[in-house]
Every structure is written in C-alpha cells, then in structure tokens.
Amino acid sequence: MAYSYTEKKRIRKDFSKLPDVMDVPYLLAIQLDSYREFLQAGATKDQFRDVGLHAAFKSVFPIISYSGNAALEYVGYRLGEPAFDVKECVLRGVTYAVPLRVKVRLIIFDKESSNKAIKDIKEQEVYMGEIPLMTENGTFVINGTERVIVSQLHRSPGVFFDHDRGKTHSSGKLLYSARIIPYRGSWLDFEFDPKDCVFVRIDRRRKLPASVLLRALGYTTEQVLDAFYTTNVFSLKDETLSLELIASRLRGEIAVLDIQDEKGKVIVEAGRRITARHINQIEKAGIKSLDVPLDYVLGRTTAKVIVHPATGEILAECNTELNTEILAKIAKAQVVRIETLYTNDIDCGPFISDTLKIDSTSNQLEALVEIYRMMRPGEPPTKDAAETLFNNLFFSPERYDLSAVGRMKFNRRIGRTEIEGSGVLCKEDIVAVLKTLVDIRNGKGIVDDIDHLGNRRVRCVGEMAENQFRVGLVRVERAVKERLSMAESEGLMPQDLINAKPVAAAVKEFFGSSQLSQFMDQNNPLSEITHKRRVSALGPGGLTRERAGFEVRDVHPTHYGRVCPIETPEGPNIGLINSLAAYARTNQYGFLESPYRVVKDALVTDEIVFLSAIEEADHVIAQASATMNDKKVLIDELVAVRHLNEFTVKAPEDVTLMDVSPKQVVSVAASLIPFLEHDDANRALMGSNMQRQAVPTLRADKPLVGTGMERNVARDSGVCVVARRGGVIDSVDASRIVVRVADDEVETGEAGVDIYNLTKYTRSNQNTCINQRPLVRKGDRVQRSDIMADGPSTDMGELALGQNMRIAFMAWNGFNFEDSICLSERVVQEDRFTTIHIQELTCVARDTKLGPEEITADIPNVGEAALNKLDEAGIVYVGAEVGAGDILVGKVTPKGETQLTPEEKLLRAIFGEKASDVKDTSLRVPTGTKGTVIDVQVFTRDGVERDARALSIEKTQLDEIRKDLNEEFRIVEGATFERLRSALVGHKAEGGAGLKKGQDITDEILDGLEHGQWFKLRMAEDALNEQLEKAQAYIVDRRRLLDDKFEDKKRKLQQGDDLAPGVLKIVKVYLAIRRRIQPGDKMAGRHGNKGVVSVIMPVEDMPHDANGTPVDVVLNPLGVPSRMNVGQILETHLGLAAKGLGEKINRMIEEQRKVADLRKFLHEIYNEIGGRKEELDTFSDQEILDLAKNLRGGVPMATPVFDGAKESEIKAMLKLADLPESGQMQLFDGRTGNKFERPVTVGYMYMLKLNHLVDDKMHARSTGSYSLVTQQPLGGKAQFGGQRFGEMEVWALEAYGAAYTLQEMLTVKSDDVNGRTKMYKNIVDGDHRMEPGMPESFNVLIKEIRSLGIDIDLETE
C-alpha cells in the first residue's frame, strides 16, 4: 500500500479484519454532481443533455403567439465568468454567481400565405439574470454567507395503491385506494367506499363515481364491462338454458342439478358444494356445457344489450339485473344467447358493475359536464369548456408531467415491461390502474409500502433549482405571449420581448429563502460535511412536522446501506431529517443505491454493483463479515443474510450478493464513533449529533482511538489544503505554500507552479475560527491529493474534534453528581480546551434626512482615553485589545436643531462651539465581550472619498497579489531557464552574446551571462535556436499575462463597492475572543456521554497513580450502566494502551536506542497484534525515526465500526505497553495521599468541548427595554431581558409570608411604570425608598374584561 505524505509521518494501527474492497466514495459527490448536471457548464450546443437548465428551456420554448403568426424558439445558452471569486464574494457580501445568456430565435410567419411561409427570422442573445455557482466544497455564497441546499426525500411520482387500515368505517373494513401522483399536475385518486363502489377524486375534490371518468374518456358501458369482466354465455332452447361451462368458475357454488358425465355417472349430486376435486373430475370428463333451470340466471347482470331478434327492440339494457319479467320477455322473443357478467364473492367482485349502476351520467358529454361542475363549481358548463378542462387535466404536456421516473414507476407497478413512455396519461393507463385496484380488492396483489425507499426518491440541488427556474420561465412565457402579437407588426427584437426579472426573482427566492436553503453549519469540518449529506423529508412538496406520523419517521428495512438508522435530530424532527449512509449514492432516477459485491456459487467476486431498494428485494445478501477462506469462498454451513427485507439464514450457494463494508449501514458521523457496536442506539444518536457541535480547539489533537474514517472526512470536507498536482515545495510560510510542479504533471501552456494561499483566522458561520497551518517544509516532495496544510479541527490530515484526556471513572466528593465533569487545572493551564471565537461587528454610515453620517475620530463629549485606540480616520487599529464599551469605529450622526438653553447659547457665543448638532453613534464593543482586533475592512460607495485607512488596506492587498504573481513568474522563469540549460550545455555556439563561433557552451559561461542575454545566443543547431525563440516568447507571454491579471485585480479593488441604497460607508471590525474552559461549559465524549463542567480543581488535589501522574478528568461511573454505552469504557482501555506505547517509544528515543530496535518494536505494535499489516520494511531509517517521533504522544489506533478491536487484542496491547491487563490501577487521593479502597478504571478518552458555552448563556439585566403592552421587562439574552418571576415563584414568597419582597417584585421591579421611574430617581438622589403604584398588567386585565363587554372600573376612595 502506498502511504501519502501525512500517513507516512503517523500511521494508525488498524484493527480491521476485513479487506477494503472499495474506498469510501467522495463524500460531497451528491451535491457537486447534481449541480454540475444542472448547469452543464462548458458543454457545446450539440453536447447538451436533456437535463437541468437545458431541459427547463426546452419544456417552455417555443412560445407561440395567440394568433400563431410569430414564435420564439430556444437555441442554446452560455454561462459567463463570475465577477468575483469566492473569497471576495464572502468579504463584499455579494452572491457568487455567473450571468446566464440565452440565444433565442424570433420567427415571424407570413399572415397572407396559407402554408405558414416564414417572413422573418431574428436571432439574439438575451441576458436572463444571474445563476449562483456552487463552490468546490458544495456550498453556495448568497449575499456573502455560505449556504447549503439540503436534498429532499419525497414521494416518487407514479401510482400507489394503499388502504385506510380500517380506520374510516366503523366496521373496520379495509377500503382500498389508488393514487396517481405526477411530477407536476393534478393528482388522481380512486377509492372504494364501504358499499364497494369505486369513486374518483381529482385534486382531492368532491368524489364522483369512477365510471364518470371512464365515460369521459369515451368508453361506453359495454366497453367498460368488457374491459373488467369475463362473461358467462347461456344458450336458450325451448325453455331450457345451457351454460357454456368453464369448470373452474363453479368452485364454491352449490350444484343446482346433478352433474353427470357422458355415461351418466354422477360427479356432483344436487345440493352439494362443488370443490376443487369435483372440478378436476369435470375437466377430466370433458363436459363442455351444463343444462341449468331458467331461474339459475335470476339476479345475474347482463354483459351486453339483449335485443329482440325480429323487431330489434331492446329487451334488457347492458348492466341490468335479470328478473322474472325480463326472462319471460326473453323466452317469448326466442332469444338464442344471453351473456351475463361472471362475478363471485371470493375473487371477482361486482364493483365496477355496481358503480355503473349508481352513475347518473349516460354518455361522454354528460360525464365531461359532471367533471367540469366538480372542478369549477358555480360556473356554467359549455361543451368546449368541459372538453378543454378535461384534456388539460391529464393529457396536456404543459399542465401535466409524470416525468421519466413517474412513467418508469407507473409502468412497473401496473406490470408493463417497457419503462419509457409519454409524460402524460392515456386512456389505457387509467383503465390499467383501475384494473389493478380492483384486482387488489379481489385479493390478487398487495398494497404498496409508502415508506419503502423504492417509493421515495431524493431531489438534489440541481433538480430543485431546475424546477424553480422553470417556474420563473413559465411566468415569463405569459408576458412574452402577449408581446409576440406586437412583435408581428412593430418589428421588435427578442430582447424587447423577454423580461428576465421573473426568472432572476424565482432563482433568488429559491437560494435565499427556500426552506431547504440553509445557513451552513460550520462549527467544524464534520458538521459541514454532514450538512451537505443531509436528506430532509420536510420542505416544499414534502411533509410537515405536525402531520408526519410514526411510520414515516421509523427506520425501514430498505434504509440499510442508504440512509443512516442512527443519525437524526432529537426533538420534533426526529426521523424526518436523515443522513446519507457512507457508501450511498443516487441513481439517474433519484433513488438511493447501495453497493454490493457479486457472489456466484458461494464465491465472492470483486465485482461491485449499485442497487436501489427495489432492485435488491429479490437478492439474498450476506453481511460483509461473513466468513470466507483464502479463495474468497463462503465456508459457513448457514450464512446470515437479508432477503425480502427480512433477516434470515441461507446456505452459501443461495447467496447472490454481499455487503462491501461493515460501515456501509451508518453515516459519516456515526462511523467516527469507535466501538459503536457496543453502544445503545439512543446514545449513539446523541454521540453522532454532538460531534457536530464540537468547537475547534486552539491546538488540534488527533484521537488516540479513532475509526480510520478521520482522514476521509478531513480530506473531503475542504478545510485542508490538498495538492492539486505533485511536485516540490519551493517556499512555505504561515500564510502560503508555493509548489514547483513536477515536469510530468505540467501540461503545455500551463504554469508549472501552484500557489496555495492559506486561510488565516477567518470567521466561520458559527463564529468559530477557521485557520490553516502548513504541514510541509521547503524541499519536501508531495504527490497529487496529499494534504499540505491542516485546517480547523484537523491534525496531520485527520479530523481532530477534541482532545485526549486522562480520565478516571470514580465518584469524587459529589463533584460529578448527575453527569457533572470534574476537571484538573492542568487542562486550563495547557490550553487544552481553549477555543478562539471571531465576532464580526459592523458600522454603517448612512445618508440621513438631516445630512450624511460621518466616520471620524472627532466625537463630541468623549475623552482622549476613549480615542487612543483609533487612528486619524476614527477606526480602531489592528492588534488593539478592547473590552466592553470601547469605541471601535467613531461615528457621528447629525441631529435636528433643538431649542438651546440660555447657558448653551452663552457657551456658543463665547467658544463658538458647533459640536452639539451631531450625536455620538459610534460602534462600541458589546457587553460581556473582550478580545483583540484582528482585521478591519472598509467598504466605500462609488463617488464617496476613501479615507486613509481604506487606502492603506487596499495597498496591503495589492502588495500581496503582486508578491504572488512575482513568485509565480520567478518559478516559471527559473524552470524555463533550467530546461534551456540542460538543452544548451555541451552544444556549440555560432556566436552572439560575446561568444566565438564553435565555442562549447558550459555551465560557467551560462552563469556569467544575464538571463536576457541567453536569448542572444546563436546555436549551430536550428532546433536549439528555435527552442530559444520559443522560450523567449513564452516568458514574455507569461509576464504579460501576469501583468494583466494584476491590473484586473487592481481594477476590482479600486472600484467602489456596491452598497445598499442610502449607505455611504461600511466598516467591518473582526474581534478574536479567546475562551478557556470554565465551570458551566458543556463537554461530551463520542458515545453520547455529555455533561457540564462542575469544578476545576488544582492539579495537586486530583487523584494520581503510584507514579504520581494525576488524572485530568473525573467522570461518574454511574453514567455508564443505565445508558448502556459501554463503548466509552473500551475506548478508555485502548486509549490507555495507545498512550502507554507512545511513552515506551519516547523512552527508547530518549535512551538513543538503535533504529533496528525501534523498527522491531513498531513491527510488534503494527503487525503482531490482530488487524491490518503495515509495510514498515519499505520505510527508510530516517522515515522510521520521523514516524517514531510523531508517535511519542501515543500510537493512534483505528477500530472501525462493526469490525473493531476485540477484547483479547486490547489486552494484548495493554500487555505490550507494560500496563495491567484489567485497565484498572490503584489511585491515591491528592489531598490526603490515602489510597482509594479499590482499583479504578483509568485511561484516555477523547473529549469534545461543545458549542454551548456558559459565556454565551449567562447574562444579567441592569436596565433595559420593556414589553409594549404589559410594560414588563423582556426575556432572553438577545433582548437584554430579565429573569421571569413566575406564578410558582410568587407562591414561594407567599408561603414564606414575605409580603414586602413580594410587593416589590410585582410592582417596581416589574410593571409599575411610575413607581420604577420614581425609584430610579430616588436611588440617584441617595434616597432608598420606594412607593409602589398600580401594576400595568392590572390595566391590561381590565381592558381584556371590557373587551368581553363587561364594564369594570376601579373605585378610588
């Protein structure tokens, strides 16, 4: 196995037993692929596929005018270039988008000619607004904030059969129904009522008999019956009836007469019930007809009209019940043949026939009118209107679309073989659905399971954006149609016809405010990746929280390998928001697929197939952990398998597929929990969710016990810097890495240099800090996709959300009661859980009615001390340490002329002071905040003069850009001259640059020449001269290209910013706030074991072992048994072993042992105790030393989900580290030095600090705002509110009889307006008395009673 740059430096000991058949796929593929399909950027006109934007345009165009004399056709589209790159968009608060230009063709037909001759054609490109672009990490930048569009899991279009589970009717009878759901258009429902008639509803309106719909489709009663029933044929001869016999239909009936064979032998006696045995005998005897008495047909229903053979008079209508009167007429008229419907109570009910009987319509027109009345009640129906409405409902491509998915699901469900077809319904479709529904009612076939993942599909970003875009286009279409009639006469161009505003508005609305367009969760790399892989059942066209029942939220067998059964939020959204499983992907129809290995005759192959939930149903699927021999043959007698969505066991020969990996069941977050298989599901759910809330610590620390997925998450999340091409590190500093690309990876015409600017101390969406640190050194070789710099919460290319803490499970003085956590002061001293939070504070200078606001250091009534951190422009310096109330940006606002007091007039006359007509509206640091200014950005409107600060910021940015471009040029130039040197040395010169003819060129000669003179050399060989010319042209070209790039960036920086109307200037100040861990902060492990820090004890008081090593954290052992998350104990044991081995390696290095000894010990760790073998022999001695140095803090272990370390392996590891195999040790009390009475479990657990910090929650109100109606203080930190003294608290004071305190609480401290104002005044005067008055809430009560019409007044004495 090849190791990457970072893997070589620190190898994880992997305990997995199963080989990797397939790597975990790229985790953001679902987002990126979907949007790439939507845009089809870079495709030429012929390459466009019928998806995304192209499909939306094709579905709306061509637009034809009402008269039909003009048409607007769509030719193609192209996307422009974005005005700013992603970082600039975030900084400036704009949307990262590209302009969309559509080429349309206007065709005007000649009115006079009969065969629509073309009179004029105009083609033009029309601007259709901006389309947001997806960043390479699967996010969108909308108005400067990063957002994610969450995929939606919705009911697939198609046809579904269901029943009401006996809830509708009191008898508990199952009422079956069918529903045709299109991708867009009207829903069509068929349903049975308790009397077994079939009804139809369109768009959930009033129901009509289903036969009305069939008649509207043009079927006659006879055709309907013919489609749904078979017939019994009776021949009538001389008062006797003869039935053409189909033996199987007699089953269950009672014989009216003896049934005899040809020889007269009785097969069934009269009065006996006919059984399957009798039917066999009848068929054997070959009886073709059966004589029955006339009354045998009484009560049966006619299948065809019965006509008098002589006169043509209708004796009985079709679908009429035969009675004695009709029979008498038939016998009299000597009718020869009667056809009746074959129905019975077992498997062929008379449902459609009964429905026809209650149907009041008799022909197509009446049926159409009836449907029109139901859809448009109150409007007078006409024949044309009724026909148009009906045709538009299901048969018009503009109004109705099943989509490819819908057609495929529809055809499969009704048993057709082809999967493609029209997007609209046809007659046959509707009849087929009714037939299937009647079959299900008759007991043939089963209803669908709506929660089966074969009936729910995923709508990704691209598809939702396409739908929104189409909505915009349809709005445009209406306007264009009206203008097209003008275009015929007035010679307009396409540009004059199309108004792109509705399209732009629809797209903007979707990305800005759709329920599924969410503010990205950017706490840490895991939360980013999980957010992008989320699948929600909520949103437009989906479910709502209130209506979603238990079934929809539950785990379904088809979730296996597609949707994670663990990761879902706790609370009202449980089960509605899910996460994709690690290996899942969507197919072309949007159904989730999971990968499997193909198994043939018990031999497991390496062929991998992706199957959707429907496709896998018939397969027999073994688990990934099924036992195989060396030849990959399944060897167990019985294998645990999944078949037909059930878990069962089968023989190896029956197995057809096998899981690719044990972790394919769970999502990315759940697959990061070691020993997940030992945790209770509820706690695992909490563990998955809490990892997403971990705040990136100051120094990331890799987990000692991981699962091996950490590297994938860090790489795919996009927070690390990954090498685009392999090469050598040319230079590296804290803020950028320059790579000289290897020659074999440079394509012609490209620069052989990659420059990576690192993100330094940037604010994330959640105010945490994004900072990248380089891992490479100058001169290192890197390969493509190696990790060169760590981001937040990553350590050497691995996800590192928390810190490894030495913990002990023991009760300790009640400090860890109820999940509290007791910490050692050492944790704070070493800054283990110190986090940096970055706050953005904005100051906006507007143009007001009274004049413009001004940003300045000249602020009225403010002392010098308050201004000493501001520069002359009135903006705080970068690096200043500021606290609550300090001025960050000085700003003054003009205030209206006020009446001056005589004193002020006098002062003005003496000092000529004008400062009083402006008021101080400076940006100050909010309460409870203390930090360092790390950055300032100034945005100025076009036409407003820029201040000195803005100019200095611009100069710094230009210097950075110039430095980058110069560096790039230096490397390109250096590489070119190196290539020339190797080509020229040893060849003869013809002259030039002061050389003699025939002189050999050496390195010394070239070193003596300036670079510019190399090109003056004339060589003896023409090929070399040509190479020199090409090199010179290339270098000049490159220089010009880089200069153009610089000018372009300069132009962008110097142009004014596009600010909101009325805004002159915006100053953004970024504060970095350092937060150490403190009591009240929430911490957690990865197993759902969460708690709040209760106390931070001095190191010397903490329990310590015999060597004097104190523990860092004391946890309560009672938190484990009832919660059943035993994974944390195993993690603690393995963590202890990992740390012990690291210490052992450290001792070997300090004792300067031989490399061979180190190599032997590493071999013991990696290759002798279970799990995967590592190829340490391929490492050089230096690499072994580097590896050992990085292992001194502990040997990282990986115990993959469901394939992790066994108990015996943990014990072997502890033994190798010279630690007790029990994982327990004797501890001593730090305060007394006494032994604790029994050994304690001590080890290393990975702990996270969650983004629920006490600093963000704690606040105290002094004076603040009041609620308008009740005049009581507001609640909550955001409103600077007070603590509610509620009903129960009042009871408590009443119980103590604390009358004065109670009065104070309910009046002056709450809503007695006059009382509290007076009291404030008294306190200022030093008089500490209060006079309670009438609380405002009492007045509110009086007003409410009056609103009920009761006059109530307070009597004053």
From Swiss-Prot:
Name of the protein in question: DNA-directed RNA polymerase subunit beta
Assembly notes: The RNAP catalytic core consists of 2 alpha, 1 beta, 1 beta' and 1 omega subunit. When a sigma factor is associated with the core the holoenzyme is formed, which can initiate transcription.
Function comment: DNA-dependent RNA polymerase catalyzes the transcription of DNA into RNA using the four ribonucleoside triphosphates as substrates.
PROSITE patterns assigned: RNA_POL_BETA
GO BP term (any one): DNA-templated transcription
Segments traversing the membrane: none
Reaction(s) this enzyme catalyzes, per UniProt: RNA(n) + a ribonucleoside 5'-triphosphate = RNA(n+1) + diphosphate
Species this protein is from: Pseudomonas fluorescens (strain SBW25)
A Pfam family that the UniProt record links to this protein: RNA_pol_Rpb2_45
